[in-house]
Curated annotation (Swiss-Prot):
Protein name: Beta-glucosidase 5
Source species taxonomy: Eukaryota, Viridiplantae, Streptophyta, Embryophyta, Tracheophyta
Positions of the catalytic residues: 192 (proton donor), 405 (nucleophile)
InterPro entries on file: Glyco_hydro_1, Glyco_hydro_1_N_CS, Glycoside_hydrolase_SF
One GO MF term: beta-D-fucosidase activity
Superkingdom, natural source: Eukaryota
Record-listed a beta-D-glucoside binding positions: 46, 336, 405, 447, 454-455, 463
EC number: 3.2.1.21
Pfam families: Glyco_hydro_1
Length: 513
């Protein structure tokens, strides 16, 4: 049972992107609406480093990684050293012709004690970044929370497992709105509540590393995998609603800004046309996507979740339902790949999220059934992004959609990343198709601008448009082929790539096979 659950969970969280996506550009920047923005993204813990500098307190991820729980016992103590190199990166953003940049704020850097006194040096750091972006005409998108919580709040009341976090998160957001809102009009409250809660409170694979036997991927000392993922998401949704209400009442009129949330998505194809596999595909989206979005649009969880999870799924009071309902100005989605889904009988006895969803995942239709080894690679499927966008539009009406993360991860950190160029070309092309079909998509962000510490693999996977040499303490950047292509595309032309460089990229790709 535990082995099967581990395989299913790994299939969900450890599918790392490899392989080229055949694509021809066939479009230019000018084919997209003028108000559509193209950008790139990083996050505070994964990018900044400076973990104990200028008043920053430890986050849950500092504690987690310092316990040696990541591959190679890696940490983000320095990461890409964005705390010291942001000015250089701003220049690279200008060189890349970025139209927008999505960053997250470190709560531990802004309010080291989780509540109360604000750290002026933390404010100065983010003000300097924001000022630099605005000065160069780059639109600023801020994520308030991207998995890194002040450890003091974990110690005091178990973080997202306690309703006490609602007031602390609201107070933290209030500081950010007040200090940065005059220059920032695009806000995202929380990143990926769905996947974050599964990894943090079911498998124990993400900080704070809570789980219970027999469900954890790693050995956990505390946690309850059967209930904690649902409690954490419930509190995240209530916190989102509270912060949205604050923003709308106190700041939105003056700033004319918008606020939303980010949800992890993948397109799910039924493995067969059988009734049970078709139902499994729908159940997959109910548990993964609608778990977060349905309450924020319609005020309650999907009925299938209530039926299967039962009393382990928290319920909204009437007042809470009214608060969460309609608390989105836009939908933010992170999207990387598609999966094939088939039905798995609902287990008896104690269950966790993975058992509740009762689904098997495969990277392709020809993959063998899940066994002792989970698939670790999957080919790109740009059509899946288009289908996901259109599906969200059909489900939730004309809410604007921002694709806040999309990118290509590789264990080969070469600068000759032709596979990544092909991936980006094909996925951006799928967005254009969705737009022409009437989808209300407003922006697209490549993950990531520079190589960063990845939450699942540490430094084992590279996603950056710019390569970072993590073996060099100065963390030098080097433009990849993908950075040059993206820059050319944003200049409304296709980049001229030296044929010898393409040949080198092809040779490296063959050597990796």
């Amino acid at each position: 049972m535990a082995a099967a659950i581990a395989v299913v969970y790994l299939s969900l969280l450890l599918l790392l992107l490899h392989g080229a996506a055949p694509a021809v550009l066939g479009y230019t920047r000018g084919d997209f609406p003028e108000d559509f923005v193209f950008g790139s993204a990083t996050s505070s813990y994964q990018y900044e480093g400076g973990f104990d500098e200028d008043g920053r307190s430890p986050s849950n991820w500092d504690i987690f990684t310092h316990q040696g729980k990541m591959p190679g016992r890696s940490t983000a103590d320095v990461a890409a050293d964005g705390y010291h190199k942001y000015k250089d990166d701003l220049k690279l953003m200008v060189d890349t012709n970025l139209e927008a940049y999505r960053l997250s704020i470190s709560w531990s850097r802004i309010i080291p004690n989780g509540r109360g006194d604000v750290n002026p040096k933390g404010l100065q750091y983010y003000n300097d970044i924001i000022d630099g972006l605005v000065k160069n005409g780059i639109q600023v998108h801020i994520m308030l929370y991207q998995l890194d919580l002040p450890q003091v709040l974990e110690d005091e009341y178990d973080g997202w497992l306690s309703p006490r976090i609602l007031e602390d998160f609201k107070a933290y957001a209030d500081v950010c709105f007040k200090e940065f809102g005059d220059r920032v009009a695009h806000w995202i409250t929380i990143d990926e509540p769905n996947v974050a809660s599964i990894g943090s409170y079911d498998s124990g694979q993400l900080a704070p590393g809570r789980c219970s036997d027999p469900f954890g991927i790693r050995k956990c000392t505390v946690g309850n995998s059967s209930v904690e993922p649902y409690i954490a998401v419930h509190n995240m949704l209530l916190a989102h609603a509270s912060v949205t209400k604050l923003y709308r009442e106190k700041y939105q009129v003056a700033g004319k800004g918008i606020i939303g949330i980010s949800v992890y998505t993948f397109w799910a194809y039924p493995l067969t046309n059988s009734t049970v596999d078709l139902e499994a595909t729908k159940r997959c989206q109910d548990f993964i996507v609608h778990w977060v979005l349905r309450p924020l649009v319609f005020g309650d969880y999907p009925q299938v979740m209530k039926n299967i999870v039962g009393s382990r799924l928290p319920s909204f009071t009437k007042a809470q339902s009214e608060d969460v309902k309609g608390s989105l100005d836009f939908i933010g989605m992170n999207h990387y790949y598609s999966l094939y889904v088939n039905d798995r009988p609902l287990g008896k006895g104690t269950r966790d999220f993975v058992a509740d969803i009762s689904i098997y995942y495969r990277g392709s239709k020809t993959d063998p059934p899940p066994g002792k080894a989970a698939p670790t690679s999957i080919g790109p499927d740009p059509q899946g992004l288009r289908l996901m966008v259109q599906y969200l539009q059909e489900t939730y009406g004309n809410l604007p959609i921002y694709i806040l993360e999309n990118g290509y991860g590789s264990s080969n950190d070469t600068v000759h990343d032709n596979d990544r160029v092909d991936y980006l070309k094909s996925y951006i092309g799928s967005i254009l198709t969705a737009l022409r079909n009437g989808a209300n998509v407003k922006g697209y962000f490549v993950w990531s601008f520079v190589d960063v510490f990845e939450y699942l693999t540490g430094y084992g996977q590279s996603y950056g448009l710019y390569r970072v040499d993590f073996a060099d303490e100065s963390r030098p950047r080097q433009a990849r082929l993908s950075a040059r292509w993206y820059s050319g595309f944003l200049k409304n032309r296709e980049m001229d790539v030296d044929q010898s460089e393409l040949a080198m990229a092809a040779a490296e790709s063959r050597a990796q096979q």
